[in-house]
């Protein structure tokens, strides 16, 4: 069985033909249309059409609140033109084939559960650190979608009750690569729009630049506190960290150290006795995670997997 797989991001659409063994062919990417949903549908059809005779359908991972049963997207996230529309039905009508949809963060979590860093886990979580914070929650060995398909939408988690109205006090704004770079610009006295990316930041941090290391420590504490909260709420065995910066050993090493420090800072409290610590690991899949997860979601839907 071969499937046309789309990983729809805010800036690009990654695509490939993938089989049940995760073998990928004809992989590539194109810019994501920013103007209209009609342009978006035209783009998907143009990518699908050359492969229509060799694939059984389309599997998609995309941003937003995605009802995987009906294909309805109640909130399009980075692609607001999808908000309130039957994306699954629209793609199916345009391409003339079966279509399955999954939220991008949940797709990444499904990939890690089925074939990555979370194989065999009963309770676990995935944090995808990027422009925002995505991911998914695993409970009792199953991906948790929630009654409204919004489980695991970490970006909306409030980080400061005293500033509830300030949307800057959410995980999206505190624990994202976007915020890491913004803190670094501010620490260096650079303009808020100064060109900067994660690789440049970690080049500075790995070189021992004091300002970069100071910002990294602050950032890791913001993330570690949320990992701690997950530990308390869900008793997770592992938290897998994904996103481009997760490839940096310095990030994972610093995050583990800061996370352990949270427990040590309350070490003399009798109420901390027996509170478990989770294992922080890097995601196994990187840029292919959403495609792999979209494929697994498709295979579950058509009954090809247990």
Regions found by a protein language model. Name each.
Residues 1-57, 68-70, 91-97, 114-120, ...:
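ATP-binding/phosphotransfer module of carbohydrate and carboxylate kinases, centering on a glycine-rich
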Residues 119-174:
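Glycine-rich phosphate-binding loop of actin/hexokinase-like ATP-binding domains
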Residues 88, 99-124:
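Conserved phosphate-binding catalytic cores of ATP/NTP-utilizing and phosphoryl-transfer enzymes
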Residues 19, 62, 69, 139-140:
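A cytosolic small-molecule/anion-sensing beta-strand core signal
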Residues 72-83:
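A charged helix-plus-loop insertion that forms the helical arch/lid used to bind
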Residues 104, 130, 294:
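Active-site glycine-centered loops adjacent to acidic/histidine catalytic or metal-binding residues
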Residues 23-24, 73, 143-144:
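Hydrophobic "anchor" residues
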Residues 7, 59-63, 126-132:
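Short beta-strand segments
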């Amino acid at each position: 069985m071969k499937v046309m797989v789309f990983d729809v991001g805010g800036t690009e659409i990654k695509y490939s033909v993938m089989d049940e063994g995760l073998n990928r062919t004809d992989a590539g990417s194109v810019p994501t249309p920013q103007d209209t949903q009609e342009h978006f549908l035209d783009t998907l059809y143009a990518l699908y059409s050359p492969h229509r005779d060799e694939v059984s359908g389309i599997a998609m991972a995309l941003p937003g609140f995605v009802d995987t049963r009906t294909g309805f997207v109640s909130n399009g996230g980075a692609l607001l033109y999808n908000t309130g529309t039957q994306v699954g039905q629209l793609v199916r009508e345009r391409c003339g084939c079966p279509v399955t949809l999954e939220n991008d963060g949940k797709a990444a979590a499904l990939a890690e559960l089925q074939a990555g860093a979370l194989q065999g886990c009963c309770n676990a979580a995935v944090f995808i650190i990027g422009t925002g914070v995505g991911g998914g929650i695993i409970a009792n060995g199953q991906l948790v979608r929630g009654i409204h398909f919004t489980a695991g939408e970490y970006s909306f988690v409030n980080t400061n009750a005293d500033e509830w109205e300030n949307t800057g006090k959410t995980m999206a704004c505190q624990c994202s690569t976007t915020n890491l770079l913004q803190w670094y610009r501010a620490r260096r006295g650079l303009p808020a729009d100064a060109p900067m990316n994660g690789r440049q930041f970690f080049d500075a941090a790995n070189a021992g630049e004091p300002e970069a290391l100071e910002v990294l420590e602050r950032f890791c504490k913001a993330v570690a506190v949320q990992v701690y909260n997950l530990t308390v709420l869900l008793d997770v065995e592992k938290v897998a960290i994904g996103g481009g910066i997760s490839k940096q050993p310095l990030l994972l090493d610093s995050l583990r150290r800061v996370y352990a420090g949270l427990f040590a800072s309350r070490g003399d409290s009798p109420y901390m006795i027996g509170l478990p610590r989770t294992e922080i690991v890097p995601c196994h899949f990187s840029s292919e995670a959403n495609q792999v997860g979209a494929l697994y979601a498709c295979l579950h839907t058509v009954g090809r997997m247990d």
